[in-house]
Amino acid sequence: MASLRELKGRIESTKKTKQITGAMQLVSASKMSKAEQNARGFVPYADKLQEVVSSIANANTDAQHPMLMKREVKKTGYLIITSDRGLVGAYNSHILKNLVNTIEKNHTSKDEYTIIVLGRKGYDYCRKRGLPVSKSVLGVPDHPTFADVKELASETVQMYADGDIDELNIIYNHYVSAISQVVTNKQLLPIDNLDESGAATSDYEFDPNQEQILEVLLPQYAESLIFGALLDGKASEHAASMTAMRSATDNASDLIDDLSLSYNRARQAAITQEITEIVGGVAALE
């Protein structure tokens, strides 16, 4: 059995850990609230841009664009959004497990796919396992702006335009609520989720022509989808961090209770032993 000094030391150490995890929980909660606002605030812009693109793409015209057309898939790009730091529970492992399962299911050679990474955890994971990483951005801020990912988003879209990849999928944690985040794996390019009712619900006049507008808008739209997923993923990351720190704080409380009980029992046993020795000594003197 541990000594009273050891038990007391463990109790004090656990109390300090509890204070740290409690503070980290509050910080994560604050970051999550801001990240959630950012993610939800971006939705109206993304929806309006999709409406405009849908209206042009679905108009009665011969206008076409490679980003709207499926082609034979010889190589697939996977854009994964992970965190730069740990202490986020299963946030990263769920994304990386989904990536590995998708690769094992759809590919037999590393030549058939490449990975674009946002976040150090995903980058380190891929490098350690020898997975092909073509582009990466590390050290993404807690509340990113479009400028933070503009270069990577633009280069990734250009990879599709140049034929370096024939489709682009994105894998990230979709934010549902503070206690619920869902791993999402969806196709980003070619774009095939445009609302076909767009042309019927919106009346636009095009100047210049549709082809020229699509040439500018479609890359911007694809880049906005990447940024929107990043904002969504950041909200999920902070929610996962908050949940992990709350769980750690609760576990620390339980451990303190258990250690305190053990300490009190040990102290009681020590007192009883001392009393027994005193009584025995008195009896011997008599």
Swiss-Prot record:
GO cellular component: plasma membrane; proton-transporting ATP synthase complex
Keywords per UniProt: ATP synthesis, Cell membrane, CF(1), Hydrogen ion transport, Ion transport, Membrane, Transport
Pfam families linked to this entry: ATP-synt
Biological process (GO), any one: proton motive force-driven plasma membrane ATP synthesis
Stated role: Produces ATP from ADP in the presence of a proton gradient across the membrane. The gamma chain is believed to be important in regulating ATPase activity and the flow of protons through the CF(0) complex.
A GO MF label: ATP binding
Compartments reported by the entry: Cell membrane
Topology of this chain in the membrane: Peripheral membrane protein
PANTHER family: ATP SYNTHASE GAMMA CHAIN, ATP SYNTHASE SUBUNIT GAMMA, MITOCHONDRIAL
Major localisation: membrane
Assembly and oligomerization: F-type ATPases have 2 components, CF(1) - the catalytic core - and CF(0) - the membrane proton channel. CF(1) has five subunits: alpha(3), beta(3), gamma(1), delta(1), epsilon(1). CF(0) has three main subunits: a, b and c.
Family per similarity comment: Belongs to the ATPase gamma chain family.
Protein name: ATP synthase gamma chain
Domain of life: Bacteria
